[in-house]
Design a protein with these regions (language model features):
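Conserved phosphate-binding loops in nucleotide/dinucleotide-binding enzymes
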Residues: 21-22, 26
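Electropositive, glycine- and tryptophan-enriched low-complexity nucleic-acid-binding patches
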Residues: 34, 38-51
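Conserved polymerase palm-domain catalytic core
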Residues: 1-11, 15, 47-59, 63-188
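Short, charged, low-complexity patches
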Residues: 28-33, 37, 94, 146
């Protein structure tokens, strides 16, 4: 039977001098994760909202910047929020992610497989540590899982707020855990 292996923890420098932890999956895990990602993308790509750009097929950073430029210049944008969800990948709730995944995935085997990867732990300097939260940056499946989480936890909420409560025009562009919202009205 297939067993998920712990990710190997390495660190790479961030532009601000701090270190970003990456989780490098074993080759077997990468292969199985790629197969799962292919299946899950077919399910979730039809659900993801148009203002989500990060780590999606056929979408790029340049397209996100173009969408932001068009939104800010073509609409009356007077106020901007530029946000980064600090430590998002490292602190993502497994419990909430699994709840979100269960909305669209009925196959218990797929759900158990995803849970195995989330709980496989990390190996750093030969020591294994459990993972109770987070999804390793560097794993094949992590960007898609992050997009699923943010689709339910952020995108749907923002879309609902924008259509029901916003007084003026609102521009939204999200790339992974970074997003920009432009408002016409300060009260929004």
């Amino acid at each position: 039977a297939y067993r998920a292996k712990p990710s190997k923890r390495i660190y790479i420098p961030k532009p601000d001098g701090r270190m970003r932890p990456l989780g490098i999956a074993a080759l077997e895990d990468k292969i199985v994760q790629q197969a799962a990602r292919t299946v899950l993308e077919c399910i979730y790509e039809q659900d993801f909202l148009g203002f989500s750009y990060g780590f999606r097929p056929g979408r790029s950073r340049h397209q996100a910047l173009d969408a932001l430029f068009v939104g800010v210049t073509k609409q009356k944008v007077n106020w901007i929020i530029d946000a980064d969800i600090r430590g998002f990948f490292d602190n993502l709730s497994h419990e909430w992610l699994m709840t979100f995944l269960e909305h669209r995935i009925a196959d218990g085997r797929m759900l158990r497989l995803l849970k195995k990867w989330l709980r496989a732990g990390v190996s750093e300097d030969g020591e294994w540590s459990p993972t109770k939260v987070g999804t390793p940056q560097g794993a094949v499946i992590s960007p898609l899982l992050a997009n699923v989480f943010l689709h339910y936890a952020l995108d749907l909420w923002i879309q609902d707020w924008r259509t029901r409560q916003a007084i003026g025009e609102v521009t939204i562009v999200r790339y992974a855990d970074d997003f920009v919202i432009g408002f016409r009205e300060e009260s929004d």
